[in-house]
Every structure is written in structure tokens, then in C-alpha cells.
Amino acid sequence: MRIDKYLKVSHLIKRRTVANDVADAGRILVNGKAVKASYAVKVGDVIEITFGNKPVKVRVLAAEGPDRKDVAREMYEVIE
């Protein structure tokens, strides 16, 4: 799954277009490297998002999943 879609489905960012813009601005790092919106997310990846005043760091637990709010939280674990 592309990182822009993953961020939307996991409810880390509300809209895919916003996730795309954040990635294009270089504010999404995966395993310490800036990535484009088309990056394919893999289980175990560490994603750092600098969005607004609060940076978020999460580890991917599931790279695929339904777009349902009740299971979105199970797709990642917050590191920082």
C-alpha cells in the first residue's frame, strides 16, 4: 500500500491529498529517509511525520487493512 493511502486508512492523517502534500514537502521519513507519496509501506517500517507542532513516530504493524476506524489503531504502534 502506498504511504499516502496508508496514512489515510490508518487515520494518522485525515485526507490522502494532505498526506500526499506532506510527503512532497519532505516531512515524512521512513526508516530515517525522506520518501515520496508512492513509497510502498512494509511491516516493520518506522514512519516519522512532522505535521503541525507535534511530530509523530510510529512502527507499521500491518501494511494492509480495511478503511474502518475501529481497526485503524491496530495498523501501527506509537513509538514517540
Q: What residue spans do the PLM features occupy?
A:
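Ferredoxin-like alpha/beta domains used as RNA- or RNAP-binding modules
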Residues: 1-5, 34-36, 40-80
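A basic, amphipathic helix-loop patch mediating RNA/tRNA/ribosome contacts
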Residues: 1-43
